[in-house]
Amino acid sequence: MTIDLNCDLGESFGVWPMGSDAAMIELATSVNIACGFHAGDADTMRKTVDLAGTHGVNIGAHPGYRDLHGFGRRPIAGLTSGEIENLVAYQIGALQAIATMAGHRVTHVKAHGALSNVACEDDMTARAIASAVKAVDPGLVFVVPANSRLVAAGEAAGLPLAHEVFADRAYEDDGSLVSRRKPGAVLHNADEIARRVVTMLQSGEVVSITGKPIRMRMDTVCIHGDTPDAVRIARTLRQALKDNGIAVAPFNLIK
């Protein structure tokens, strides 16, 4: 068995640092880089692209709502389909330009935060994101939360998909993520997270916060780079995967 490990990086902004990108990028096989709307800036994007290129990991765009103050974790109501398409295409294009200048290429797109959460439940938003990805480059892999409406939107657009599960987030019984506003939504114990992910991969099931097993396709596992002890969590998980005979590789290299 082989799995991809993806991490959201490039979330620093100006003089304000966020995360431990240099350490995390050594443990991931794919990275999702903030494109300036919810976090990041041109210089941070370039630094993160260079790091990713040095370590041979997949480079992905991580578009979100234009909400620096809220880190893209607050829904923005009233956007039209066209407005969503434009904000997604804008951010993908920005990272593509930076990557091209650095001699690398963008391989995938993963929606960030509230944009992703809304799209998981709202067909219009999901279709708009998928439409933007296809319009920019139909060869981009669309990284989507497993069992969400983004899966159907990506399939309808004819995009290659990577189904994602989360190492450090709890799930509701319907397969959606537990809101960050609720207790227990974000997991922090590295050993428990590692055991959980190994069990998920071996069983093909995620266990919800109430104990309900949910079947999910799993192509990539996300570890959030802004989680406290993210580096320790990632290292513990990598070791647990190795101990259980589970290899890691970029999803585009997994047969």
UniProtKB/Swiss-Prot annotation:
Self-association and partners: Forms a complex composed of PxpA, PxpB and PxpC.
Stated family: Belongs to the LamB/PxpA family.
Assigned keywords, A-Z: ATP-binding, Hydrolase, Nucleotide-binding
Protein name, as recorded: 5-oxoprolinase subunit A
First-level EC class: hydrolase
Gene3D superfamilies, A to Z: Glycoside hydrolase/deacetylase
Single Gene Ontology BP annotation: carbohydrate metabolic process
The reaction(s) this protein catalyses: 5-oxo-L-proline + ATP + 2 H2O = L-glutamate + ADP + phosphate + H(+)
Cross-referenced Pfam families: LamB_YcsF
EC numbers on record: 3.5.2.9
UniProt xrefs under InterPro entries: Glyco_hydro/deAcase_b/a-brl, LamB/YcsF/PxpA-like
Role played: Catalyzes the cleavage of 5-oxoproline to form L-glutamate coupled to the hydrolysis of ATP to ADP and inorganic phosphate.
GO molecular function: 5-oxoprolinase (ATP-hydrolyzing) activity; ATP binding
Top-level taxon in the UniProt lineage: Bacteria
Disulfide bonds: none
Annotated source species: Nitrobacter winogradskyi (strain ATCC 25391 / DSM 10237 / CIP 104748 / NCIMB 11846 / Nb-255)
